[in-house]
Amino acid sequence: MRRAICLVLLASGLRLHAQAPGKWPPDSLINTRVIPRSTPVSQVVGMMRNFAADLGVRCHYCHVGEEGMPLDRVDFAVDEKRTKLVAREMMRMVRDINQRLDSLPGRVAAGLQVTCATCHRGTNRPVPLFTMITETATSQGADSALRVYRALRQRFYGRDSYDFGEPTLNIAAFRTARAGKVADALLLLDENEKYFPGSSGMYVFRGNVLLMRADTTAAAAAFHEALKRDSTNAEALGRLRTIGRPR
């Protein structure tokens, strides 16, 4: 609740207007930018509650203040932080998207609306997990990437913020290898093996990564392992034919 209330100025530029010092919440809005000025304060608080939950953030993410600071001391009016300015633009973007959705020909789900949660899902940076892991692996190495992965898995597993299914580390490993970090890519696949033992597809990825460093023998062994785990794996069969190591 506190997290949501303290973000109440995100889009409105709210100021304490004709109020006693320290009064919170105020009785009215002024200096609004996106939310209509006539919107009841209680309704704005509810909107901000949703925004806060959707991004998993607190007051000081957008407003000038510190964690745990009393709300009457947070400077909600000043537009100092980039995150607050971005938030306003994102609200305008969401509004425009929903207006365009309503104009789609043949649309049947008339009640469907895009919200912050549609992309953010409880995180302030809405990117796929494989992108985050790839970025970290290519810039800081597999050890750092795996620390990030494990921390996120511990915090978010079972929620819809990130996809911890088998493809995530497979894709991250492949993209890391394409960036010239084959050894790091193989470490990502080793980690994935812990969560998905017996996977056939993972060994196809391993074989493809090994081919990137021209290790045909090791790649063939990986493709054979994929077939051992799933004799119908067509991609593994095709790769073996391509490298001249048919089953």
Predicted regions and their residues:
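Sequence context surrounding c-type heme c attachment/ligation sites in exported
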Residues: 19-178, 197-198, 232, 238
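A conserved position within tetratricopeptide repeats
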Residues: 153, 157-160, 193, 227, ...
